């Protein structure tokens, strides 16, 4: 799904730890990864993306957003512990309202989106070393 020429939606959301992220107030680029707890590629990629971002772009906000109604905050908390990624990076999109702004039709997981201000920097379905190299250049 191409984002070329589109303006990213504005939104705010709270992390599992209650920290509020407001896209209107963020001046730096930020990265969103849409996932759900029973998604095999997400389980593999979330620790990889977290480690990559912590190492290469520690000041760029990284949000792991779960839009699936059946995934409770407790499920996501356990998921974060299992993957050894701090829960402060995880967000529950309780009504799917944020995710719907990013996906026209059907959601696909994982989807990784990079945004700066009013422009998309990238949008990938899944990541590998080549894509991580590309993200490093784009942020």
Q: Model-derived features: where do they sit?
A:
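N-terminal "domain-start" segment that seeds a small globular fold
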Residues: 1-23
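Short, small/polar residue-rich loop motifs at catalytic or cofactor-binding pockets
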Residues: 7, 28, 107-109
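Short active-site neighborhood of thiol/selenol oxidoreductases, capturing the structured segment around
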Residues: 21-43, 49
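Hydrophobic beta-strand anchors of alpha/beta hydrolase catalytic cores
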Residues: 31-32, 62, 112
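Structural microenvironment flanking redox-active thiols in thiol-disulfide oxidoreductases
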Residues: 43-83, 96-100
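Thiol-/selenol-based redox modules, centered on thioredoxin-like
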Residues: 55, 109-139
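Short, internal strand/loop/helix patches
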Residues: 80-111
